[in-house]
Amino acid sequence: MSRRNAAVKRPVLPDPQFNSRLASMMISRLMKHGKKSTAQRILSDAFSLISERTGGNAVELFETAVKNATPLVEVRARRVGGATYQVPMEVRQERGTAMALRWLVTFSRARNGKSMSQKLAGELMDAANETGSAVKKREDTHKMAEANKAFAHYRY
């Protein structure tokens, strides 16, 4: 274990185009091989597609989608006396948001569709309507935590 001080968390600056911290975080998650401008274009294209289809504010819909995909509890493996238990634990706000963004990107990539921006727009609209794979993943995570509630006293 490192004896040095813990690294200082840098604040996430809001994206200049959408003036949103979440959008900035999403761009970082979308980015592959350091191509940030490509990731920004994908997100802005997805937002314009969302605006066309819904006629509403795409950034607000995006924030709703992230909120709907954010888990409140998760299970973590804990070894006790030779047995490994799945212990349910609360998720901190930051980690929950990060997980939601990661799931949205992962399931967008897995979708069938033409371009990444279309797939991302579809996944975001589904998540905002409380359907879609990212929301299902959150529900599955909550079910796992509920099923393993008996091991909650092993929390650390």
From Swiss-Prot:
Listed GO MF terms: rRNA binding; structural constituent of ribosome; tRNA binding
Q: Could you tell me which CDD domains the record lists for this protein? A: uS7_Bacteria
Pfam families with a match to the protein in the record: Ribosomal_S7
InterPro entries membership: Ribosomal_uS7 (IPR000235), Ribosomal_uS7_bac/org-type (IPR005717), Ribosomal_uS7_CS (IPR020606), Ribosomal_uS7_dom (IPR023798), Ribosomal_uS7_dom_sf (IPR036823)
GO BP term, pick one:
translation
The cross-references to PROSITE patterns, in alphabetical order and at most eight, read: RIBOSOMAL_S7
Q: Which UniProt keywords apply?
A: Ribonucleoprotein, Ribosomal protein, RNA-binding, rRNA-binding, tRNA-binding
What assembly does the database describe for this protein? Part of the 30S ribosomal subunit. Contacts proteins S9 and S11.
Give the protein's function.
One of the primary rRNA binding proteins, it binds directly to 16S rRNA where it nucleates assembly of the head domain of the 30S subunit. Is located at the subunit interface close to the decoding center, probably blocks exit of the E-site tRNA.
The name this protein carries in UniProt is Small ribosomal subunit protein uS7
Species in which this protein is naturally found: Prochlorococcus marinus (strain MIT 9301)
Starting at the broadest rank, the lineage of the source organism is:
Bacteria, Bacillati, Cyanobacteriota, Cyanophyceae, Synechococcales
